[in-house]
Amino acid sequence: MYAELKDGMGTRDVFDGWNVQKVWQKEDEAWINRTQNSGMKLQNPAFAQGKNWERPVICQDIFWSRDGSSIVTIHDDYGIRQYVMSLEGNTDQLVPYSRMFKSQSIVTGRVHPLYSLYNDTEDFNVLLTACKDLPLQMYSLQDTEGPCLNHYNVINNETGNWEIPHAINWSNEDHFLIGSVKNRVSLFSCYRSSPIWTSQSKRGNSTSKSIVSCFSERPYGEFSNAKHTIFGTYKNELHLLDHRTQHPQFLHRSAQGRGYIQLLESFNGHYLYALKRNTNLIDVLDTRESHRPVNQLQLPFTMGNQKHKASITSTNGLTIGTDDGKIVCWSSNAIEFGVIDRNGLTCDNGAGEKPELTHEMGLNSSRINIVQQSPTDFGVCALSYSPDKMTYRPDVHASSGIYVTELTTDWFGL
């Protein structure tokens, strides 16, 4: 079934094209027009010389504030941007509220789940970033011109090199987990530079060099379980880590794909939806049965090396973008029961359960690589669209950007 799309607000043509410096120029012009020459300026990068800027600017991640009033985006131009959802209703263009740059490529980052520009305290308005050849760092989203608030020791004592975290997840207000090479997971306090503990899976030589690629995520960016964590690796393995014993337990190895990139929990916590690279299938695992695979969801395309990120909400269920500019969905009722019908049946040909709903977004020349749904306006989502960064420069116009809109879903009409 296909659904209509309501009008939204987006970055228009700011991120279009294949020249990073021109993107910054267009963004500056949009900022000046919005602020009417107030004298305020967006932060500019201090490292433009000697870089290869003939490429598109692609969003790597999107985070909503807890009150739905703003979003934070991480882009591959080393930039971190904040956008405030307009309350005036007289503009359809997203212009950054703030923009800051790192000196190195951002491998991964994570905004504090309690972040909001309307917080009474700045303690939660922070972002963790992991970059190449740098320690893990915490930055303020309130004072984007300020220095690093804290840095965390991720150095390998054997080699003397920084180990790059590939996954970050907040456990509670003051603690977070990082995952890196050799199946290594560490728990940090925000206020200590060294880890509280470090755990490492030892499943023999075949997995000794696995990279922890993702942690399980609760809906709406809630804090993860304080007692245990599920993490995935680029070796297609899932592990359960008990925080009390710090001993990981092997759960499952998938035969399809080339590494887990996202693990989404259902609201009731009974099912885990596991996304992987280089496959068109999403694994469905039953958490009550030692994470036994019980079903699969079939995507209308095969995910490549460019990550696609989905989200789960109580209104729209599981939503994910496609490589031809659409959004596909499985209803919340289906997601809460593993997309298994009332008779306990699943798709019997091994192809996976097809989407129940498709949203036409009018972005046929671009792929929608991120869909993040608002934690307060349950039908509203922020999405990122871009060309495939793994291909050579196309002849057609490359369309990239951020778009915020409402997905109108009438599941009862299906």
From Swiss-Prot:
- The signal sequence is none
Instruction: Name any Gene Ontology BP term.
Output: RNA splicing
In its keyword annotation, does this UniProt entry include Secreted?
Answer: no
Which keywords annotate this record? mRNA processing, mRNA splicing, Nucleus
Q: Does the keyword Nucleus apply?
A: yes
Protein task: Involved in mRNA splicing. Helps to stabilize the U1 snRNP-5' splice site interaction.
Q: Which family does it belong to?
A: Belongs to the SWT21 family.
Assembly, in brief, is:
Associates with snRNPs.
Name this protein carries in UniProt = Protein SWT21
Q: Which gene encodes it?
A: SWT21
